[in-house]
Regions:
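Generic intrinsically disordered, low-complexity segments enriched for polar/acidic and small residues
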Residues: 2, 74-77
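Short, charge-rich amphipathic segments
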Residues: 30-44, 67-74, 100-116
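Soluble catalytic domains of enzymes that build or remodel membrane lipids, polysaccharides, and related
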Residues: 76, 80-253
């Protein structure tokens, strides 16, 4: 119900509030000869862009191959394929939009990765958005597993509820990810071995510079017990944590 409410707010802004605001500003600022025409055109453009984004735009799916060269990568992992996806917000994928999630899962599986990683924001607001999508999410498989970390939305911070309810919902989100067969990393790491070589997949909880962002990431705890010679792939939802926390406090590659 909350997701439909949020979607309704966005549609109200795109189809009503923003066009009216554009028209009003044009009527107020522009010369009398042009203000009505430009206001109508501006409002129409906003409405068309909103309609496109809500229908065709949201259906766009792009795979971006990136080659990363590391001199200290263990030889056995040369050519190792990692698929990363993030910010799925599957609560938005209801009704006819469910096909988008299926297309995304199909695309991920078509990459034939050695490992799949998800870097947070599986839900919009609450874990009750997730059960109807577990069948699709459970299709994600890779030889070395599927790993995930939590994003700010996964902590239920945007839900209007007391702290105990939010904590319970966060635990439920974690449980759903595990039911999908994902290995959720909460300030912890796993070791992937190939012969005598190894690669560390570390997952740090969310840490962000914004005030409302959860600050649960702990670099020391995430890498506890590892030697500095270990090759580390660090998973984290918020990009700001890379320079602010991870680089100064670790040797993660």
């Amino acid at each position: 119900m909350m997701v439909q409410y949020v979607n309704g707010i966005f549609l109200l802004i795109g189809f009503v509030i923003a066009p009216l605001l554009c028209y009003g500003v044009c009527r107020w600022l522009l010369p009398r000869r042009w203000r009505c025409k430009i206001g109508v055109v501006g409002a129409a453009v906003i409405i068309l862009l909103t309609a496109y984004g809500w229908t065709f735009g949201s259906q766009q799916l792009t795979v971006r191959p990136v080659t990363i060269v590391c001199s200290d990568l263990p030889q056995s992992f040369d050519g190792y394929r990692i698929v990363q996806f993030s910010d799925a917000h599957v609560g938005t994928m209801t009704g006819w939009r469910k096909a988008m999630l299926q297309r995304a899962v199909d695309s991920i599986m078509n990459q034939r990765a050695d490992i799949i990683v998800f870097t947070g924001d599986l839900q919009n607001i609450e874990p009750h958005e997730l059960p109807e999508h577990l069948a699709q999410l459970s299709r994600l498989k890779a030889p070395d597993g599927v790993y995930s970390v939590l994003g700010n939305h996964d902590y239920a911070v945007y839900q209007k509820a007391d702290s105990a309810t939010k904590a319970a919902n966060c635990r439920l989100t974690c449980e759903y990810e595990r039911r999908a067969g994902w290995q959720l990393l909460l300030n912890e790491h796993r070791t992937i071995r190939r012969g005598s070589d190894s690669l560390i997949v570390a997952g740090m909880e969310n840490w962000g510079v914004a005030k409302r962002m959860p600050h649960r990431g702990d670099v020391g705890k995430t890498l506890a017990g590892l030697q500095r010679s270990a090759f580390v792939v660090m998973l984290e939802h918020d990009p700001s944590a890379w320079r602010a926390r991870i680089l100064p406090q670790s040797w993660a590659q």
